[in-house]
């Protein structure tokens, strides 16, 4: 099973998770500490403290959003339902921002 080394707060990690989901790929998430000095497990597994990093079943490692997405997009065919998933995710994200967290609301003095 693929292993994604990532953090929840990282926008690049989020985009990689989204793409893996669109492609219907199961993967294991490895949470990485915020501080680079605390990333010994990541360094041991992939040789760097950069996130996101994706480790494939065959031992191949891709580091960084651009490298991971390029590898996924060139190696795998997108399933028919990927676009529908993308649209639903974007709609849910907008709804959350508008209704739940009120992030898009202007600050009131």
Where are these regions (language model features)?
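GST-like domain detector, emphasizing the conserved glutathione-binding G-site
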Residues: 1-8, 12-109
């Amino acid at each position: 099973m693929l292993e994604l080394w990532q953090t929840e707060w990282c926008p690049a990690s989020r985009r990689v998770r989204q793409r893996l989901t669109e492609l219907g790929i199961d993967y294991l998430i490895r949470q990485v500490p915020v501080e680079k000095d605390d990333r010994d497990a990541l360094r041991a597994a992939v040789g760097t403290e950069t996130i996101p990093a994706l480790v494939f079943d065959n031992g191949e490692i891709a580091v960084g959003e651009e490298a991971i997405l390029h590898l996924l997009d060139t190696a795998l065919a997108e399933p028919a339902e990927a676009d529908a998933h993308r649209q639903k995710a974007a709609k849910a994200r907008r709804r959350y921002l508008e209704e739940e967290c009120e992030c898009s609301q202007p600050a009131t003095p």
